[in-house]
């Protein structure tokens, strides 16, 4: 798996290419941890070039979502479609991960304010993994 990264201010757009599976989830986790090590905790995972995610890949996404939240950041998903959207729907994780159709919307979401001026949660179901 190849993972390109684009830095947009405080946000890193991660663009993996290939399947996120048992064989590749270690590479994904390593890339995320490397970003955490340099203080980058606001991540957008662009799934446009990820044709397939298995249970191990999904587990890695969940674990890194939790890790990002604990570090004061977040992991948001971009270009989720087909098999991956179905997988997230069946597992009810569409209520946990915020998903976006545009990079700009995903990036802006880290800075939007919710009711009472509080920063919006990284996900509608964010308390589940707090």
Where are these regions (language model features)?
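Short, charged low-complexity linear motifs
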Residues: 15, 82-83, 124
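Acidic phosphotransfer microenvironment of two-component signaling modules
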Residues: 82, 104-105
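Short beta-strand/loop segment at the start of cytosolic alpha/beta domains
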Residues: 1-15, 129
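Amphipathic alpha-helical interaction surfaces in cytosolic regulatory modules
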Residues: 19-97
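Residues at or immediately preceding the N-termini of alpha-helices
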Residues: 25, 103-104
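Intrinsically disordered or compositionally simple regulatory linkers and C-terminal tails
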Residues: 108-130
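Conserved catalytic submotifs in the C-terminal HATPase_c
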Residues: 8-10, 48, 104
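Short acidic-hydrophobic, aromatic-tinged amphipathic segments that line or gate anion-handling sites
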Residues: 98-102
């Amino acid at each position: 798996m190849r993972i390109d990264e684009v830095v947009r201010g405080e946000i890193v757009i991660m663009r993996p290419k290939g399947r996120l599976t048992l064989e590749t989830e270690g590479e994904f986790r390593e890339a995320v941890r490397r970003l955490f090590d340099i203080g980058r905790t606001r991540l957008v995972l662009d799934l446009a070039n990820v044709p397939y995610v298995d249970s191990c890949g999904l587990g890695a996404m969940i674990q890194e979502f939790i890790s990002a939240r604990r570090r004061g950041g977040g992991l948001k998903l971009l270009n989720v479609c087909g098999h991956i959207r179905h997988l997230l729907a069946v597992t009810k994780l569409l209520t946990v991960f915020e998903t976006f159709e545009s990079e700009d919307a995903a990036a802006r979401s880290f800075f939007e304010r919710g009711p009472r001026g509080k920063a919006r949660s990284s996900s509608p179901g964010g308390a589940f993994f707090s």
